[in-house]
């Protein structure tokens, strides 16, 4: 999207009015002709690109101190807010997955191409470059609404916040979809069939499905997870089973030791226990996110843990806030590193 002269003039006027900079300074630098000011101090950029993986290299900084973060597509966090001192320049790179639809697989198509938002408390961008990265590794995510790229604030899936932990060369391909179970994820061609066709040898595939398997019996649940694992392996991918994030449902003693919190369904199927046992029997890596999130919620207690979920905003103790998704994504990233599921050089 090349700026018209009128838009360029408006952009320069807005920058001069909003930036705490010396006279004549453009805090966004030069060469950003795919970008326009939003009116809130941020910079929105659009690139007409086909679906695929792309490297983004950005030089942050300016004549005055700044702090810049980058998000993109459907509210994906791509680069954590990064401070720069006056006169400092910092180069950062990451890889982004561009797909259609851009968010949830069964959701709205969104905008074709790549959209980036350069914001933060004081955005300072000197240059921006986007180049094809056809050989990048994709880290696929299979899951439900607790994982997906949620389109509307304040709902946020942990998969939406995971990209900030990855360096250039690995892109999160979040194919999680709200409301899906092991049954529906396999049945809908827009879901697993699409993921399966895109997997290349060595691509990690994280699988977290449980919240919506409310009436799935144990044998069927195990069979569906086994099918997912085996079909990923058949493509040369590296499946990783992930136990579900807990619900914020406290006992009187301040623990989460109950079926609602720990995802035991109406048939008495203990999903986390089934996943742990299956991972052991199949020799599949396991990220025990149930145990990790349980420990975090219990550590915070009944009151402080509300901030991790949408308890206050929506009376929702299942779906995470931006803060909760951010913390849970960090737990997943730490496990990817600790278990060697991604090379250490790929993680920030």
Which residues make up each language-model segment?
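Structural recognition of the beta-strand scaffold that forms the well-ordered cores
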Residues: 138-143, 147-148, 171-176, 203-209, ...
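Secretory targeting and sorting signals
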Residues: 1-23
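Alpha-helical scaffolding segments of alpha/beta enzyme cores, especially the outer helices
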Residues: 194, 223, 227-230, 234, ...
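Solvent-exposed loop/turn segments at secondary-structure junctions
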Residues: 62-64, 145-149, 177-183, 211-216, ...
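Serine-esterase "nucleophile elbow" of acetyl-processing enzymes
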Residues: 116, 122-178, 191-205
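Catalytic His-Asp segment of secreted/periplasmic serine-dependent ester chemistry enzymes
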Residues: 188, 249-348
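Oxyanion-hole/transition-state-stabilizing segment in secreted/luminal serine hydrolases
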Residues: 187-223, 246-249
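Compositionally biased, intrinsically disordered or flexible polar/acidic segments
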Residues: 20, 24-152
């Amino acid at each position: 999207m090349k700026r018209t002269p009128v838009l360029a003039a408006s952009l320069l006027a807005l920058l001069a009015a909003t930036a705490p900079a010396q006279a004549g300074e453009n805090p966004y630098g030069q060469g950003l002709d795919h970008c326009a000011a939003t009116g809130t101090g941020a910079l929105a950029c659009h690139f007409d690109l086909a679906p695929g993986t792309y490297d983004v290299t950005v030089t942050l900084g300016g004549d005055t101190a700044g702090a810049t973060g980058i998000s993109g597509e459907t509210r994906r966090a791509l680069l954590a807010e990064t401070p720069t001192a006056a006169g400092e320049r910092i180069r950062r790179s990451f890889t982004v997955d561009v797909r259609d639809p851009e968010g949830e697989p069964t959701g709205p198509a969104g905008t074709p191409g790549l959209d980036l938002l350069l914001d933060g408390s004081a955005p300072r961008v000197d240059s921006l470059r986007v180049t094809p990265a056809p050989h990048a590794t994709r880290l696929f995510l299979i899951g439900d609404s607790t994982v997906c790229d949620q389109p509307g604030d304040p709902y946020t899936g942990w998969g939406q916040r995971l990209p900030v932990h990855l360096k250039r060369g690995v892109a999160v391909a979040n194919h999680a979809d709200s409301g899906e179970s092991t049954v529906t994820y396999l049945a809908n061609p827009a879901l697993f069939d699409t993921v399966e066709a895109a997997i290349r040898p060595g691509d990690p595939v994280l699988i977290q499905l449980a919240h919506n398997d409310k009436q799935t019996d144990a044998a069927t649940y195990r069979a569906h997870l086994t099918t997912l694992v085996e079909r990923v392996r058949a493509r040369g991918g590296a499946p990783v089973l992930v136990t579900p994030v807990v619900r914020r449902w406290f006992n009187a003693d301040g623990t989460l030791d109950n079926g609602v919190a720990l995802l035991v369904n109406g048939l008495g199927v203990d999903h986390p226990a089934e996943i742990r046992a299956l991972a052991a029997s199949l020799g599949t890596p396991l990220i025990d996110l149930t145990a990790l999130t349980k420990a975090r919620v219990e550590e915070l207690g009944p009151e402080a843990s509300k901030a991790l979920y949408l308890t206050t905003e929506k009376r929702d103790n299942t779906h995470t806030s931006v803060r909760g998704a951010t913390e849970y994504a960090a737990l997943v990233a730490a496990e990817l590193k600790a278990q060697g599921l991604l090379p250490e050089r790929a993680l920030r």
